[in-house]
A protein has these predicted regions:
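Conserved donor-binding/catalytic core segment of Leloir-type glycosyltransferases
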Residues: 194, 239-257, 263-266
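Nucleotide-activated donor-binding/catalytic signature segment of Leloir-type glycosyltransferases, i.e.
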Residues: 279-305
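Short hydrophobic beta-strand element within catalytic cores of glycosyltransferases
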Residues: 336-339
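Conserved acidic donor-binding segment of nucleotide-sugar-dependent glycosyltransferases
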Residues: 351, 355-362, 371-377
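Short alpha-helical donor nucleotide-sugar binding micro-motif in glycosyltransferases
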Residues: 306-311
Length: 421
């Protein structure tokens, strides 16, 4: 009889990072003889094509009600009770061999109902932690705010109006207690928590989830897409004629991603230097100074890889991040990275693949970039690509998950792999 894998995530769309990950894990699992099922929010993604069998959860009205409970009463993850009961009934019928949680926030699940069910069955549970929401009373990142309340107990949340925004109530103190009770209810041997960075594991070891069993599995990328390219096409398309090209990429540009820092850096550029920013909105593009070329968000990954290849240095002045994929993509295209010492952003950067500077030190970031330019990109290109081939292959990271599933089903212990091995 085939083993059954059930993954749970709010989105299924491949143009979202977690949607792509759950689909590709499912596809690889099927190649290795598993039946693959994915439960997701029908209210957010509708009925979508997928090679795995899908279990749509809730509907648009359910998402809207959950959104209202979030906006008014700070009850994110505490609505959608009926939709979650229906999901539990499907899970009971399906009897999966492994349950793999991804994001359980996203306006579609009532997490106390889900975890009461998980605590009462014997099925191994894997939980990939893509952000910090699981162990805070409200926010999904706290680095930029400099908040450490999550270590001992939240309350009077400084980020109440940020995702998942609450316009009226601050329930962060009770949310913290509710999450702690639910997320520590499973026996340690049945829940394996998978942070996507060593940094996040270190943070969780200081949270109410400190006694969990952890195994870090980094995210990977498609190395057959992100590889060194000739740059003539994008150079002409975007009129990039300067001698030295610095690149920055984000899905959304905001203060937390380093927008203000890059504007300061642009004011320091020489005439033979240009900053290219990918992911800007039309409004942001109109605001850019003349020595910054703004490119709106593109789903054309081949063009994005060409832009990575064109740049001499990739800049990532992020103030909060777990394990940014943009760093991996740049390095895979042979381009060294200069990043702030932020979260897991440093984990792909070695002396051979880039440099790390302190948060907010824009002058040091530009100096590091110029040091790389002076040394020559040729010094880094091969080392970057070799490092990517060894560490960033998405299929190898997905195999790590399949190996984890098999170990759990055999009742074997989960050994944390040395991140430097």
């Amino acid at each position: 009889m085939q083993k059954r894998l059930l993954q749970i995530n709010p989105v299924l769309r491949r143009n979202t990072s977690t949607g792509r990950i759950v689909q590709e894990i499912g596809e690889l699992a099927m190649v290795h003889g598993w039946e693959s099922y994915i439960a997701y929010s029908r209210g957010r993604d509708g009925m979508m094509p997928c090679q795995s069998q899908t279990i749509p959860v809730g509907g648009k009205a359910d998402v809207a009600w959950h959104g209202l409970m979030t906006r008014l009463f700070d009850r994110h993850g505490l609505a959608s009770e009926q939709a979650t009961r229906e999901l539990v009934e499907r899970m009971e019928d399906l009897q999966p061999d492994v349950i793999h949680l991804h994001n359980i926030h996203g306006y579609f699940l009532h997490y106390p109902t889900l975890f009461r069910y998980l605590a009462g069955i014997k099925t191994p549970v894997v939980w990939t932690i893509h952000d910090c929401w699981a162990y805070t009373g409200h926010c999904y990142y706290y680095s930029f705010a400099g908040c450490q309340k999550w270590r001992t107990g939240c309350g009077k949340c400084p980020q109440r109006r940020l995702f998942p925004a609450s316009w009226w109530k601050d329930r962060s103190a009770q949310n913290f207690k509710d999450k702690a009770r639910a997320f520590t209810s499973l026996p340690k041997e049945r829940l394996t928590v998978v942070p996507v960075s060593e940094w996040m594991k270190g943070e969780m070891l200081q949270s109410f989830m400190a006694d969990s069993r952890f195994k870090v599995i980094h995210n990977g990328i498609n190395l057959s897409v992100f590889l060194p390219y000739a740059d003539d096409e994008v150079r002409y398309k975007y009129h990039i004629y300067q001698e030295h090209v610095l690149l920055a990429v984000a899905s959304i540009w905001c203060r937390e991603k380093g927008w203000d820092d890059l504007m300061r850096l642009a004011a320091m550029l020489r005439k033979n230097e240009v900053l290219v920013m990918v992911g800007v909105t039309e409004e942001q593009r109109r605001m850019l100074p003349k020595n910054v070329i703004g490119i709106c968000r593109t789903d054309n990954v081949d063009e994005l890889a060409q832009l990575y290849s064109l740049a001499e240095v990739f800049l990532n002045p992020t103030w909060q991040d777990n394990y940014p994929t943009v760093n991996l993509e740049a390095i895979a295209c042979g381009t060294p990275v200069v990043t702030y010492h932020t979260g897991g952003s440093v984990e792909a950067v070695t002396p051979h693949t880039g440099k790390v500077v302190e948060q907010g030190d824009v002058e040091a970031m530009l100096e590091a970039a110029r040091t790389i330019v002076k040394r020559g990109k040729h010094f880094y290109r091969t080392a970057c690509r070799d490092y990517a081939m060894k560490h960033f292959d998405k299929d190898e990271r997905y195999i790590d998950y399949l190996c984890l599933y098999d170990r759990l089903l055999k009742g074997k212990s989960v050994h944390q792999k040395n991140p430097d091995a």
